[in-house]
């Protein structure tokens, strides 16, 4: 994912948590905050310490990052998104994880209609 689309600052993450809405399933939690029109959508990834040591947390984030990358052409513009990994994100096969992330983005209203 390009640098321009990454959400990295602590302040940005905190504002998404505080002011945004969230949807969740077994694999992940997605927090979404709408921005002004014309703002590019930015996405950040997180994994709590409860998930495991750094290697495990990084693996969970890599898997989620790839699932989001595959969805990226369909994601609407003008949002800040934070995706938080859950334990199931590590345990399930990647095609299932990709489907779960797509369901979350759909429920959050982040995907454009195809066609």
From Swiss-Prot:
Domain of life of the source: Bacteria
Biological processes annotated in GO: tRNA 5'-leader removal
InterPro entries: Ribosomal_Su5_D2-typ_SF, Ribsml_uS5_D2-typ_fold_subgr, RNase_P, RNase_P_CS
GO CC terms, sorted: ribonuclease P complex
Catalytic reaction equation(s): Endonucleolytic cleavage of RNA, removing 5'-extranucleotides from tRNA precursor
A single MF term (Gene Ontology): ribonuclease P activity
Family statement: Belongs to the RnpA family.
Subunit structure: Consists of a catalytic RNA component (M1 or rnpB) and a protein subunit.
Role summary: RNaseP catalyzes the removal of the 5'-leader sequence from pre-tRNA to produce the mature 5'-terminus. It can also cleave other RNA substrates such as 4.5S RNA. The protein component plays an auxiliary but essential role in vivo by binding to the 5'-leader sequence and broadening the substrate specificity of the ribozyme.
Name of the protein in its database record: Ribonuclease P protein component
Species whose genome carries this gene: Symbiobacterium thermophilum (strain DSM 24528 / JCM 14929 / IAM 14863 / T)
Gene designation per UniProt: rnpA
């Amino acid at each position: 994912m390009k640098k321009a689309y990454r959400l990295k600052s602590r302040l940005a993450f905190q504002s998404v948590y505080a002011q945004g809405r969230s949807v969740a399933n077994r694999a992940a939690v997605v927090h979404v905050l709408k921005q002004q029109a014309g703002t590019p959508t930015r996405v950040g990834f997180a994994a709590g310490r409860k998930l495991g040591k750094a290697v495990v947390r990084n693996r969970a984030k890599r898997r989620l990052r790839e699932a989001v990358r595959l969805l990226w052409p369909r994601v609407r513009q003008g949002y800040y998104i934070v995706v938080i990994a859950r334990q199931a994100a590590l345990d399930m096969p990647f095609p299932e994880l990709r489907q779960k992330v797509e369901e979350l983005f759909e429920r959050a209203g982040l995907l454009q209609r195809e066609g």
